[in-house]
A protein has these predicted regions:
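Short aromatic/hydrophobic "clamp" motif used to bind/position activated sugar donors
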Residues: 91
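N-proximal low-complexity "stem/linker" segments adjacent to membrane-targeting elements
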Residues: 1-28
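A conserved acidic beta->alpha catalytic loop
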Residues: 43-52
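Glycine-rich, basic loop-to-helix element that forms the pyrophosphate-binding segment
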Residues: 69-86
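Conserved donor NDP-sugar-binding/catalytic core segment of glycosyltransferases
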Residues: 103-135
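A recurrent flexible, glycine/aromatic-enriched loop bordering the glycosyltransferase active site
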Residues: 76, 139-159, 174
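Short, acidic, metal-binding catalytic loop of nucleotide-sugar glycosyltransferases
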Residues: 27-36
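C-terminal catalytic/acceptor-binding lobe
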Residues: 173-311
Length: 312
């Protein structure tokens, strides 16, 4: 059998409560990952019983790197902290409701992805029957995705990261970080591929997560909604498309203090000024029914240029 060699991967799992799902995700990742990886976990202020289990798993070397935040700073912040904590050729975000079910899962993804791994990003799809944009390899099936990918088990290589940067932290506690990243790649001409995950990964969330899922829907609606203070994601889509802000976005948070596993973040002053300008642009965007004319676009450009150059 041909030996398949995988690059070192920083697998980062952002965590916020969901005790059973989180433990299932982390246990399966450690037990079934044969390829070289660093398992990084960033806890977003979960309840004490889960934090205790995470510390135990770190002590037992199930987890390689653990960060426990003092409160919930959002999915993007947690992912970005884990991302920049490890020097690795590839970064992988795995949600804490994804369970690995195959020992060769990571090898299979990289083998199917092939040399495209250096010039594209990839994310999972389950039981996809679409005949278009499909290509089969000896190691699995891939699909060329037109715009967006699932962020549930999402891989980005260093070359792409150097151009596009980190996840956007514009969207609050739960946002459109994966869709936003895909859009930035789209506007940079970077290809996106879906890999068939049905034999590799499964979701472990259930009916008891109804309250959590309702919270996610509410957060999504705020990011895309049409009310006066809603629609940051829709605005960013417009700004990227019209080159009014850069594709490598500014980070909201930086580390304030770190004591052992415990981390406190703070908002960067530069980001605070930038976000005020972004909210001003959001007001203009919504007042124009999301169809800004040339004069309104110029006001947006000037507002963003005052805080720094966020255009390409």
């Amino acid at each position: 059998m041909e030996k398949r060699i995988c690059p070192l991967t920083n697998i980062t799992v952002p965590v916020f409560n969901r005790y059973d799902e989180t433990l299932a995700t982390l246990s399966a990742l450690r037990a079934r990952t044969r390829s070289p990886c660093i398992l990084t976990v960033v806890d977003n202020g979960s309840e004490a019983d889960l934090r205790k289990e995470l510390l135990r798993m770190q002590d037992e070397k199930v987890i390689d790197k653990l960060f426990i935040l003092d409160r919930n700073y959002g999915v993007s912040c947690a992912c970005n902290l884990g991302w920049r904590s490890v020097e690795a050729p590839f970064f992988m975000k795995v949600d804490n409701d994804i369970k690995v079910i195959a020992d060769n899962w990571l090898e299979s993804i990289y083998s199917a992805w092939g040399t495209y791994r250096y010039s594209s990003i990839t994310g999972p799809v389950w039981n996809c029957a679409a005949p278009y944009n499909r290509f089969d390899t000896p190691h699995g099936t891939m699909w060329s995705a037109p715009v967006s990918l699932s962020g549930a088990a999402f891989i980005v290589g260093r070359k792409i990261h150097e151009h596009i940067g980190y996840f956007s932290e514009d969207y609050g506690l739960y946002g459109e970080e994966d869709a936003d990243y895909c859009l930035r790649c789209h506007h940079a001409g970077i290809r996106k591929f879906s890999y068939e995950a049905s034999a590799l990964l499964e979701h472990v969330d259930g009916a008891k997560d109804a309250e959590y899922n309702a919270w996610k829907v509410a957060a999504h609606n705020k990011n895309v909604g049409g009310k006066k203070d809603e629609g940051i994601f829709a605005l960013n889509l417009f700004l990227y498309e019209h080159k009014l802000r850069a594709l490598d976005v500014p980070l909201k948070y930086e580390v304030k203090s770190m004591r052992g596993f415990y981390v406190e973040m703070r908002e960067r002053d530069a980001y605070s000024r930038f976000f005020d300008a972004l909210l001003y642009c959001l007001g203009l965007f919504n007042e124009s029914c999301r169809k800004p004319d040339a004069g309104t676009m110029e006001k947006m450009r000037i507002a963003l240029d005052k805080v720094s150059d966020h255009r390409q």
